[in-house]
């Protein structure tokens, strides 16, 4: 006898585990209930929420012994009994599940609320779900889904051929997300796998020496191997930009940041889980750390990398006209100094996966944003041919740029190959935050002027970016920012320079916007200040200076069509006028009554080049029709929650001329899909979508030519037969698919097409055509400031984003809301401090209670280069958020906070300094 007995999803169970074992581990490991997700093991994220005697609890905080004699219900139990069917349908209908990693926790918490309250208020939903974090959705769709779960949901849209594009269909991969059946990196680890733990530097900067590994192994039964830099068979370096690849898999003699990998141990899971890293044989000689560019870039600073004096990784530069002369003649000039800190991506899924050696090949499974890039990098590290590597992506529980870089992959690849055993790894939350890339901290100074009418006259920008210990995406940030720092405005006299500097901080990499959100803070605050000097409406100032078709950008590029910023600003006009009037009236009344509260309204604009900056940026799509009538789309653009699987399928279906739901999707696997490039830089809808358009059209043409019918004939797939109806003549043709020969891919008809956007290199002054397409947007925030406490409450966000063509309006809104939420974090709370904020309770991200009401205006100014006129969106949407908030705070209480985040203590101190605080 013995063990712990309880009811699990309505069945009596007894488990022999140690009573101190986490309930979450018992559910996942003992019963295979992987719908219970592990995001933090600290009760911070809520992804592991289950019901204990019908009350929601974090299963990671409960020892299994604590549930003895009680009833535990997991997401699987709720799903299998149909108890949450209406709630799941509502989540799908509202687009409330993006990456899906938080969805089980949200559903369990919502189910508890709805059990006793079928029609909760917004406040009640926010309270019930306040313990579950989401980094993708911005929460608003989740709130709507819970509030409407009682209602009869409309039937899912099933558009006909030719009507796929523009339809707000549900995520094609949504059902397994709301059923908690989608497998993420930690959900399919082989039962026989050894576990790997990375030994990481506890110091920001230190030399080290590893001791006797053989003696260590002899003293630690259950640990079967130790790996370090001497074990790398190929090149001990990786990076997303090959000429700058400088990050070792294992540091060799010097660790350059806290959290850098120096070794790895591999063994049986129980031993690895319980290992005390103080027992690892390593000695350290710390150096004085250089954590900021001002320290690291001095002439006498210790050089971190050969060939990079003063620790400068790269500089960026764009100039046109004569900025100094224009500033000298300007009627008004303003200067702005802004700073932003490290920002953690804080995806709810920590890095996890495994590798296995199979038929003399390496197979790597786990979460990534760039499967083909991972494959190529692992091949170089392992000294193997790329054809010997297969990357099989799991579902990705959030990425936002950080999962573009390698993380766990080289460790498990090396160990699995050397040991000829499956090897798995699951990062703890702290390990994920210590070791992963961050948004670049910025230190920006700019001066901008205007003439008496308000037209911009001279713009000088200087940005210093902390790129951390290794290059990662530092070159991209340094080169992209000077192209964008003007904002989407006519700026004929312009000079912008940037520099990325190495420090002993975590590598700064890609994070939604590649530095542009940082530069937008200074740029948009400056335009508000100029408008004030002119006595001009702030929206009107932006409208006067907005780029139009056939006007040159700061790189000299002119677009004949598709420049949509003026349309976005015009779309905001009615809401702006009404908000300005409301704010003015409220503040007058507050002044009369002595209230501590003041309201403000702020506006900011954005533009963003879709894809790589002046570099090749190809994407390849394959489509094939099998003899059984199944049409397969080989879609390698990684869907990390943004909806690539759905949007690209909609484009391909319309190009072929079939309903989107008739397509079968193969996504991500490097053995099965062509290279669609990385999921970053708002490129997938535009670049991969265009490749899908070309592939669909090519497949259609092949079929029509085979049947000898006109180009406008309709295609109807009926199992093993194609029926084609010539629209011009009404004639019908039938193709018996089963009678046709198949190719090497197993298809009777197949197409494969590549699209690479037309760009040109930039010259020494940054002149050229860096992007084929830009997206545009503007946002307006209404907020309330407590002058006594300095606290900010966001009331309403109105957005106007030009997407060219809304391939899927539901997904467009989801991307906007998720981006705005991350912009709120940048503006008001997020600040990653190495060694201090390495968890999700010290590092704050927006919760469900921090999100304002939303109103969206989708602007469609088609671009001839995009598929059906579409542009990218994902990066753009957080760019204007922080500056709009900062501008609104200033309008509300008269203080300009540009050293972000604008926390309550900073606002209160600024108010007290100017004598306008309120006790």
What label would you give each PLM region?
Residues 150-312:
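Flexible, low-hydrophobicity surface segments
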Residues 95, 167, 173-179, 309-353, ...:
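Glycine-rich loop/linker segments at domain edges
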Residues 229-230, 383-388, 418-423, 452, ...:
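C-terminal catalytic domains of large/alpha subunits in multi-subunit enzymes
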Residues 395-420, 424-425, 644-652:
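Thiamine diphosphate
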Residues 50, 182, 186, 352-357, ...:
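Short beta-strand elements
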Residues 301-382, 547-630, 839-857:
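Helix-loop-helix junctions that connect adjacent transmembrane helices in secondary transporters/permeases
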Residues 614, 618-673, 687-688:
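Catalytic phosphate/nucleotide-handling subdomain of diverse soluble enzymes
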Residues 1-160, 179:
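Signature of N-terminal electron-transfer/Fe-S-associated modules in redox systems
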């Amino acid at each position: 006898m013995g063990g712990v007995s309880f009811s699990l999803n309505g069945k009596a169970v007894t488990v022999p585990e140690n009573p101190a074992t986490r309930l979450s581990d018992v559910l996942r490991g003992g019963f295979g209930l992987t719908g219970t997700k592990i995001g933090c093991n600290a009760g911070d994220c809520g992804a592991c929420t289950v019901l204990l005697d019908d009350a929601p609890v974090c299963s990671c905080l409960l020892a299994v012994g604590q549930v003895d004699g009680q009833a535990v219900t997991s997401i699987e139990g709720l799903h299998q009994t149909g108890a949450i069917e209406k709630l799941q349908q509502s989540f799908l209908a509202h687009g409330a599940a993006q990456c899906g990693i938080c969805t089980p926790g949200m559903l369990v918490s919502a189910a508890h609320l709805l059990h006793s309250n079928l029609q909760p208020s917004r406040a009640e939903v926010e309270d019930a779900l306040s313990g579950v974090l989401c980094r993708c959705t911005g929460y608003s769709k989740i709130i709507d889904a819970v509030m409407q779960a009682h209602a009869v949901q409309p039937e899912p849209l099933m558009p006909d051929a030719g009507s796929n594009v523009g339809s707000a269909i549900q995520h094609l991969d949504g059902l397994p997300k709301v059923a908690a059946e989608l497998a993420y990196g930690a959900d399919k680890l082989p039962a026989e796998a050894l576990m790997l733990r990375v030994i990481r530097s506890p110091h920001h900067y230190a030399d080290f020496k590893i001791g006797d590994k053989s003696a260590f192994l002899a003293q630690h039964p259950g640990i079967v191997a130790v790996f370090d830099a001497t074990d790398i068979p190929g090149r001990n370096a990786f990076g997303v930009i090959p000429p700058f690849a400088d990050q070792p898999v294992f540091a060799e003699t010097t660790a350059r940041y806290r959290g850098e990998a120096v070794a790895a141990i591999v063994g049986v899971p129980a031993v690895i889980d319980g290992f005390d890293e103080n027992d690892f044989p390593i000695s350290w000689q710390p150096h004085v750390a250089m954590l900021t560019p001002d320290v690291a870039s001095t002439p006498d600073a210790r050089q971190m990398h050969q060939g990079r004096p003063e620790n400068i990784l790269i500089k960026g530069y764009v100039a046109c006209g004569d900025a100094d002369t224009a500033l000298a003649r300007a009627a008004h000039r303003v200067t702005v100094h802004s700073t932003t800190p490290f920002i953690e991506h804080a995806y709810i899924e920590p890095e996890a996966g495994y590798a296995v050696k199979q038929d003399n090949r390496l197979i790597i499974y786990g979460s990534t944003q760039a499967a083909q890039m991972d494959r190529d990098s692992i091949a170089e590290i392992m000294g193997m041919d790329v054809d010997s590597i297969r990357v099989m992506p799991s579902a990705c529980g959030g990425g936002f740029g950080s999962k573009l870089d390698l993380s766990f992959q080289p460790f498990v690849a090396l160990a699995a190959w050397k040991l000829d055993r499956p090897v798995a790894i699951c990062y703890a939350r702290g390990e994920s935050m210590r070791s992963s890339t961050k948004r670049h901290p910025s230190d920006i100074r700019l001066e901008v002027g205007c003439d008496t009418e308000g037209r911009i006259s001279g713009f000088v920008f200087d940005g210093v970016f902390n790129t951390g210990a290794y290059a990662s995406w530092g070159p991209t940030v340094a080169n992209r920012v000077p192209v964008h720092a003007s904002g989407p405005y006519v700026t004929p006299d312009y000079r912008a320079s940037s520099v990325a500097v190495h420090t002993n901080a975590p590598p700064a990499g890609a994070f939604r916007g590649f530095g542009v959100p940082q530069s937008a803070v200074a740029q948009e605050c400056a335009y508000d200040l100029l408008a004030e000097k002119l006595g001009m409406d702030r929206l009107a100032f932006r409208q006067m200076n907005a780029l139009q078709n056939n006007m040159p950008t700061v790189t000299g590029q002119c677009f004949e069509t598709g420049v949509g910023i003026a349309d976005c600003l015009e779309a905001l006009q009615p809401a702006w006028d009404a908000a300005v009037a409301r704010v003015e009236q409220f503040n007058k009344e507050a002044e009369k009554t002595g209230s501590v509260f003041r309201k403000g309204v702020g506006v900011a604009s954005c533009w963003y080049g879709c894809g790589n900056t002046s570099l090749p940026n190809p994407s390849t799509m394959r489509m094939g029709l099998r003899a059984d009538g199944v049409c397969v789309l080989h879609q390698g653009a990684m869907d990390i929650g943004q909806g690539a699987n759905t949007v690209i399928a909609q484009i391909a279906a319309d190009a072929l001329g079939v309903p989107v739901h008739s397509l079968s999707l193969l996504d991500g696997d490097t053995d099965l899909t062509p290279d669609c490039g990385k999921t970053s830089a708002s490129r997938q809808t535009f670049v991969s979508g265009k490749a899908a358009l070309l592939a669909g059209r090519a497949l259609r043409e092949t079929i029509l030519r085979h049947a000898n019918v006109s180009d406008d004939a309709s295609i109807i797939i009926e199992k093993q037969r194609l029926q084609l109806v010539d629209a011009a003549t009404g004639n019908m043709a039938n193709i018996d698919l089963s009678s046709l020969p198949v190719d090497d891919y197993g298809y009777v008809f197949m197409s494969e097409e590549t699209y690479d956007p037309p760009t040109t290199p930039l010259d020494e002054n940054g002149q050229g055509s860096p992007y084929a397409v830009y997206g545009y947007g503007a946002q307006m925030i209404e907020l309330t400031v407590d002058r006594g406490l300095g606290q900010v409450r966001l009331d309403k966000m109105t957005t106007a984003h030009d997407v060219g063509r809304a391939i899927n309006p539901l997904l467009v809104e989801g991307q906007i809301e998720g981006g705005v939420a991350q912009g709120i974090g940048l503006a008001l709370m997020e600040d990653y401090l190495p060694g201090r904020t390495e968890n999700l309770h010290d590092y704050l991200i927006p919760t469900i209670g921090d999100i304002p009401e939303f109103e969206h205006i989708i602007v469609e100014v088609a671009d001839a280069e995009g598929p059906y006129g579409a542009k990218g969106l994902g990066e753009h949407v957080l760019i204007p958020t922080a500056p709009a908030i900062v501008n609104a705070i200033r309008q509300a209480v008269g203080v300009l906070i540009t050293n972000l985040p604008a926390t309550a203590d900073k606002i209160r101190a600024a108010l007290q300094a100017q004598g306008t605080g309120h006790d």
